[in-house]
Amino acid sequence: MNKVILRILAVLFLLGIYAVSAQSDGRIVGGADTSSYYTKYVVQLRRRSSSSSSYAQTCGGCILDAVTIATAAHCVYNREAENFLVVAGDDSRGGMNGVVVRVSKLIPHELYNSSTMDNDIALVVVDPPLPLDSFSTMEAIEIASEQPAVGVQATISGWGYTKENGLSSDQLQQVKVPIVDSEKCQEAYYWRPISEGMLCAGLSEGGKDACQGDSGGPLVVANKLAGIVSWGEGCARPNYPGVYANVAYYKDWIAKQRTSYV
């Protein structure tokens, strides 16, 4: 290999930024292939179970700024930052066009409840910062200031399963679903409270949804981050919308956390 290339790779490794090749694990239900040029804010969270094991994609995330990734609390709760990497700028798990940054801090919401799934939001702090100005496939997204209206179309992106326990895809997927009334969502999930910190989206007939592997990924409305993939009953089942962390509800919490490290 050319000595110049070797030197460049060595420098990138020391900086904590390097090309990545990832493995396939699934995709959005009812969606279609999309490009990182249209989903520049989407990242992969990769985790290893121990210092001697390899990294594997576990959740999605969303770029808020060069050092801040928004994701679901259940993706990072009781985990160590040193066991995570963030893959950005690549829509394919098997590609070599993305970059990786190491994680320096995990900030799950202090009131996250794994039983009720309330406050299922977290921030992931990366170091070094993502080189947003150097890549046309990476870009931060603005946070929604208000909860989206019922019926508005929202876009979900991720690498989760195509169906419950279904097939997988190397390519990032995207699908549109309408925002669902919280009262109707509560009727569907009568056994678990739909709190103010939750947002529901999906089709009454089912067929389109996030699924396993999409957790932590973004739900976007009008080019703003409105929700974070959290939980649901199966995947794309009729009358069971997906449930998301309501980002607008947590905007003050996000701002407060960012002041501690930005």
Swiss-Prot record:
It comes from the Eukaryota. Its main location: secreted. GO terms for cellular component: extracellular region. The keyword Disulfide bond applies. It is found in: Secreted, Extracellular space. Gene3D superfamilies: Trypsin-like serine proteases (2.40.10.10). GO terms for molecular function: serine hydrolase activity; serine-type endopeptidase activity. Its EC number is 3.4.21.4. This is Trypsin eta.
